[in-house]
Curated annotation (Swiss-Prot):
InterPro entries: UPF0251, WH-like_DNA-bd_sf. Belongs to the UPF0251 family. Coiled coil: none annotated. This is UPF0251 protein Sputcn32_0687. PANTHER family: PTHR37478, UPF0251 PROTEIN TK0562 (PTHR37478:SF2). It holds the Pfam family DUF134. The lineage of its organism: Bacteria, Pseudomonadati, Pseudomonadota, Gammaproteobacteria, Alteromonadales. It comes from Shewanella putrefaciens (strain CN-32 / ATCC BAA-453).
Amino acid sequence: MARPKKCRQLSSCVPCSLFKPNGIPSVELTHIQLAADEFEALELGDVQRLSQLDAAALMGISRQTFGYLLASARKKVATAITQGQVLRLPSKTDKDLS
């Protein structure tokens, strides 16, 4: 049985709901969902360039968990870009994670 998720502190605002290849209807493409905590990890680690330790402290999680989230988010973004898939971003209601 999996351990319950810790409550994570999220502050990033998502500017849009998805990214997709131009000229192809979304319904014809495979969708990849980026979770709210993965989006936050990308924002803190890659955009704000915080250390994993500092970013993890801001999110209220361990450094190792932050590393897993960042790796997962990077893989999803890279897969969507290289394979021409839709990347669905978290909605405002997804931020209420526990």
